[in-house]
Amino acid sequence: MSEKILKYPGSKGNIVSDLIQLLPVHKVYLEPYFGSGTLFFCKEPAAIETINDMDSDIVNLFKVIRDAPVSLANSLIATPYSREVYDNSYEYRENESDVQKAVKFLTKCWQGYGSRGCASKVGFKTDISKREKMYAV
């Protein structure tokens, strides 16, 4: 599996191998609580797959990854790692595109720390050792 793009509360990353062994052979797969999608992306594909999440930021992010990956990547490359950008990522505007919303969501997740679900503002990451991962999309 490639580098995950989203650290998210409740991620199954540490136990995904065990969970995959417990999955029965299946033709239909439903993931009602998608989150970071760790299990979905690690398991074998099924003929019919449905994913969902109550968090509209998660749903929007993965729609943008599916529908406009180049636009998202270009926007992320142009996004500076700064406290100002991080603070502004919590301000949503009505006329923002789905790509802009996805960039803001990832900015909160990547540049912040201690935020539950990347939704509540706790703090800005000042360490630079992992900063380059933000630009690895």
Where are these regions (language model features)?
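SAM-dependent nucleic-acid methyltransferase catalytic core
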Residues: M1-N14, L22-L23, P69-V137
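SAM cofactor-binding core of SAM-dependent methyltransferases
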Residues: Q21-E91
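Active-site phosphate/pyrophosphate- and oxyanion-stabilizing loops and adjacent acidic/basic residues
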Residues: S17
